[in-house]
Amino acid sequence: MPEPSRRIPYRTWPGALAVLLAIAAYVGGLSFWDSRTPGSRPLAAGETVSVGHARFVPASGWEMDVSRSRAGQSLMLFKGGHKFLVTTRAWAGGPDGPLMRQQRLMERGQRLNIDGDVSDFVTSWGLQGKTFAYYGSKLAGRFWQVVDLQRRSLVQIDCYGASEGLNEAMADARSMLESMDLEAPQ
């Protein structure tokens, strides 16, 4: 019987080492980039910020959370343990649909309690909508919603945080809401 041919062994360690170095450089580079990229951005006093077609002037001391903000869709501001979230989206229905959905999400999904009834609000700029307060074991907040039927758009504003210092955060939130209008160019 003929003897089987002997295969010349391939050197696999250089290729494996190159793959390992490429993975290490990729992961290390991403970790380096992540550690050098700030997660928040301070906002200049009096600077108007826009999200979608909504624009407002942030209260002093609030910073933008870069990782939770999406250009043209949402803007998250924070100050201490309190958050101020503005989201905009297209909406072709009536004003009650998204508000009821948000209440259900808070009550059933997040186990929060709605405090009182939904009420109407009007700002000095003429911005009007609906609002309600909510609370849970660790946080409390207020939710505002504006539906612009002509533009077919929805703006939702949510301010929440720990009960400690909430009155000051709500005063800041009301001042930001008072400065808001829906005339930002898109």
Sequence positions of predicted segments:
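A short, sequence-level motif marking secondary-structure junctions
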Residues: 61-64, 70-71, 89-94, 146-151
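N-terminal targeting sequences that direct proteins away from the cytosol to non-cytosolic compartments
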Residues: 1-82, 160-186
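Short amphipathic alpha-helical segments
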Residues: 97-102, 168-172
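A short acidic-to-branched-hydrophobic micro-motif
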Residues: 74-101, 143-144
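Short, well-ordered beta-strand elements
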Residues: 86-87, 152-162
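Short acidic/polar mixed-charge low-complexity motifs
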Residues: 54, 80-85, 139, 151-153
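Signature of long, low-cysteine stretches enriched in small and polar/charged residues
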Residues: 107-152
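Hydrophobic residues embedded in beta-strands of well-ordered beta-sheets
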Residues: 73, 84, 128, 153-154
